[in-house]
Amino acid sequence: MYNVIFLGAPGSGKGTQGEVVAKELKLAHMATGDLFRKAIECGDELGDTVKSYMERGELVPDEITISVVLKHLAGLKDVTGIILDGFPRSLRQAEALDEALVQQGQGIGRVIYINVPEDELVRRLSGRWVCRSCQSPYQSGCAEVTKGKCSRCQGELYQRPDDTPETVKERLKVYFSKTAPLIEYYRSKGKLSEIDGMAEISEVTKRIISAIKCGK
């Protein structure tokens, strides 16, 4: 099974690219955000804990994230490969993933890092809207924001009070402090491909697919 990791800050477009590339290469797309949303929908203690972090715009702690993701991976059947979108986000998560994959006789084939300048990330995130029910994110100007409804669950869209440029910068600072070591971790293993996230969406997709195919 060929496993690919997508790394990129919030607002880098890795979720959109993950869905498109997974469809093109016939790989399963596993977005951590979707797994969290499913946990929230369950309404149990784990889901409530995840929801509290997401509503504050904070990263869900490692141990909770690892449990949610590894449980999902263990249940996957009849897939040729997986795109891991949003996981791992720290060295602790990366090590837990490596250990779990080794136990299954697998590994990571390629790591895609979508690089977008911080000022552009701040611009994108400051214009973000979120579904009040399932936490799906949308960008200002899109059809869903115009209608005020989530296309996934028809929930109400709103802007978080802490999605201001100042607060977004602080969140990105925390994100990069955890992710920078992760990028070097995979670079040292010869697995990392860095993609310019400022290119046209279709061009970014082409470069990602090329990097994945070259890595096989």
Curated annotation (Swiss-Prot):
Q: Does the keyword Translocase apply?
A: no
Please indicate if the UniProt record lists Kinase as a keyword. yes
Q: Which reaction does it catalyse?
A: AMP + ATP = 2 ADP
Location comes to:
Cytoplasm
Arranged from A to Z, the UniProt key words for this protein are:
ATP-binding, Cytoplasm, Kinase, Metal-binding, Nucleotide biosynthesis, Nucleotide-binding, Transferase, Zinc
Extract the ranges annotated as region (NMP).
Answer: 31-60
- Cysteines joined through disulfide linkages: none
State the InterPro entries in the record.
Answer: Adenyl_kin_sub (IPR006259), Adenylat/UMP-CMP_kin (IPR000850), Adenylat_kinase_CS (IPR033690), P-loop_NTPase (IPR027417)
* Binding annotation for Zn(2+): C131, C134, C150, C153
Sorted alphabetically, the Gene Ontology cellular component annotations on this record are:
cytoplasm
Give the top-rank taxon of the lineage listed in the UniProt record for this protein. Bacteria
Protein EC = 2.7.4.3
Instruction: Name the residues that bind ATP.
Output: G11, S12, G13, K14, G15, T16, R128, A199
Q: Which SUPFAM superfamilies match?
A: P-loop containing nucleoside triphosphate hydrolases (SSF52540)
Stretches for region LID: 127-163
GO biological process annotation, one example: AMP salvage
Task: Spell out the molecular function terms from Gene Ontology.
Answer: adenylate kinase activity; ATP binding; metal ion binding
The main location is cytoplasm
Residues reported to bind AMP: T32, R37, E58, L59, V60, G86, F87, P88, R89, Q93, R160, R171
Its annotated pathway?
Answer: Purine metabolism; AMP biosynthesis via salvage pathway; AMP from ADP: step 1/1
Quaternary structure, from the entry: Monomer.
What family is this protein classified in?
Answer: Belongs to the adenylate kinase family.
Q: Domain annotation text?
A: Consists of three domains, a large central CORE domain and two small peripheral domains, NMPbind and LID, which undergo movements during catalysis. The LID domain closes over the site of phosphoryl transfer upon ATP binding. Assembling and dissambling the active center during each catalytic cycle provides an effective means to prevent ATP hydrolysis. Some bacteria have evolved a zinc-coordinating structure that stabilizes the LID domain.
This molecule's function is given as: Catalyzes the reversible transfer of the terminal phosphate group between ATP and AMP. Plays an important role in cellular energy homeostasis and in adenine nucleotide metabolism.
Name used for this protein in its record: Adenylate kinase
Please name the source species.
Answer: Dehalococcoides mccartyi (strain ATCC BAA-2100 / JCM 16839 / KCTC 5957 / BAV1)
